[in-house]
Structure formats: C-alpha cells, structure tokens
C-alpha cells in the first residue's frame, strides 16, 4: 500500500523542500464564514461515514459542539506546555509534511482511496512502514509516511485505533535516521548534555510526531 505511494518521486523531491509556511491557525481562519444551522451541517468523520446518522436531535448537535470545544482546548493547552525544543520539531514537521501533502495531493488521494477498501490492522500498517523505512533511509520517505499515516487515521480509522496507530508509528518512524535529519535541520541546543543528546532527540521527536498527528482527532470526535 505505502510502497506504491513512495514510488511517485517523493523521496527525491522532499529532501530539497525549503519553504516558509504561515501559522496554520491564521491560514484557517475565515472571519466571513457564516455557520449553517445544525440541521444543514454535514459532519464527515471519514470517507464512508456520515456523522448525521448519529446526530438526530438538537441535543446531539449541542453535545458534539461541547465535546469538540473541550477537546480543542485540551490540545491547545498541551501545546502550551510543550518545551521550546519540541515546538521547534512540530514546526519542522508541519512545514515539511504539509508541503508533501499539498504537492502530492493527487497521489495521496489515490492511495487513500485504495487503503479505504482494504482490511488491515494497526500492526499490519506498522510492519509495512517498518519494512519501507529499513529499505529507504531518506528523509523524504519518513515525511511522506507521516503525512500519509496522519490522513489515513483521519479517513479510515476510529479515534481509539487512531491513537493506537499514532503511538506505535511514532516510535517506528523516529529511528536514528530521522533523528539525524531533524538534528541537521533544527538549530543546535547547547543545553542538552552530549551523553544524552540522541536519546533526548528521539524522545522529543516522538513527542512532536504524536502532537502533530494527534491533531487529526479533532476531526474525528465521536
């Protein structure tokens, strides 16, 4: 599944990406947007599920709104608590993975459609990703994998399975190669003891991936 997607020259292209991207939140704010009435809203949890099937009363809509608000506030609070170093990794992952998703949107959509018709477990995905990363040491593969897995969780899996997948995949993706790439990209931090630099970077890298991909859940609250 993923191996076909990686064949679309992404590995060669992503290594050369250098582009400043404005803050995601400011880009997504539309002050002129008029919110429709609840009965006219279409909630899309994934490619095959219409959330309207589960929201039949005004109470359901209000509860969904409250649940979304509380989850978003918790996520914002988590970001505020993260160390500066972790935030810098999140920024890097956001910039590069958003670039991949935008430039290869068509290729990714094809793979998402294929994946949505398959039956697979979290461990199936992890095993396939692990094989791909063992055979390909480039940064592009890792960034493309993060982008793909994030969107896959949004489209094809329920929140519980998504959390499990993100937890497992973040450890798989944050191998020594990924830590080396992130170290080269990010500015040096002289406050980290040399003896624990690699372990620290790997831990922070996992945290950054978990946070970046965890944002997917705000689209899947159910």
Curated annotation (Swiss-Prot):
Transmembrane segments: none annotated. Changing residue 144 to F: Increased binding to host BCL2L11. Changing residue 129 to L: No effect on the binding to host BCL2L11. Keywords: Host cytoplasm, Host membrane, Host mitochondrion, Host mitochondrion outer membrane, Host-virus interaction, Inhibition of host apoptosis by viral BCL2-like protein, Membrane, Modulation of host cell apoptosis by virus. It is found in: Host mitochondrion outer membrane; Host cytoplasm. InterPro entries: Bcl-2-like_sf, Orthopox_F1, Poxvirus_F1/C10. Changing residue 141 to L: No effect on the binding to host BCL2L11. GO terms for cellular component: host cell mitochondrial outer membrane; membrane. Gene3D superfamilies: Blc2-like. GO terms for biological process: regulation of apoptotic process; symbiont-mediated suppression of host apoptosis. Changing residue 125 to A: Increased binding to host BCL2L11. Signal peptide: none annotated. Changing residue 100 to A: Complete loss of binding to host BCL2L11. The keyword Cell division does not apply. Changing residue 100 to F: No effect on the binding to host BCL2L11. Changing residue 141 to F: Increased binding to host BCL2L11. Induction: Expressed in the early phase of the viral replicative cycle. Homodimer. Interacts with host pro-apoptotic protein BCL2L11 (via BH3 domain). Interacts with host NLRP1. Interacts with host BAK. Plays a role in evading host innate immune response by inhibiting host inflammasome activation. Interacts with and inhibits NLR-mediated interleukin-1 beta/IL1B production in infected cells. At the host mitochondria outer membrane, interacts with the BH3 domain of host BAK and prevents BAK from binding active BAX. In turn, host apoptosis is inhibited. Belongs to the orthopoxvirus OPG045 family. This is Apoptosis regulator OPG045. It comes from Vaccinia virus (strain Ankara) (VACV).
